[in-house]
Amino acid sequence: MSRLKELRKKRGYTQVKMQMLTGIDQSDYSKIENGKRYYTFEQCRKIAIALDTSMDYFAGLTDEDKPYPRVEK
């Protein structure tokens, strides 16, 4: 199972819910999730925000599915 699908299910979201949260058509989202279509940088960003994770998690650069903490200046 892809990280994207795994995390979506962990959050209890359907593909229709992801469409509502990201604005990505459900058909396109399904293709992205199943590896039949690549996502754009902007789509990846929207998905990461919707699933409360980092884009690095989807890229396999980290195994931590939580977003990075923001640094206060």
Residue ranges and their predicted role:
Residues 8, 19, 48:
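The alpha-helix within a helix-turn-helix
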Residues 12-34:
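Short alpha-helical DNA-recognition segment
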Residues 4, 15, 26, 41-44:
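Helix-turn-helix DNA-binding elements, focusing on the entry/boundary residues of the two helices
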Residues 1-10:
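A short, Lys/Arg-rich alpha-helix, primarily the initiator
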Residues 33, 43, 59-62:
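DNA major-groove recognition helix of helix-turn-helix
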Residues 10, 49, 59-73:
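Short, charged recognition helix plus adjacent turn
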Residues 23, 42-57:
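DNA major-groove recognition helix of helix-turn-helix/homeodomain DNA-binding modules
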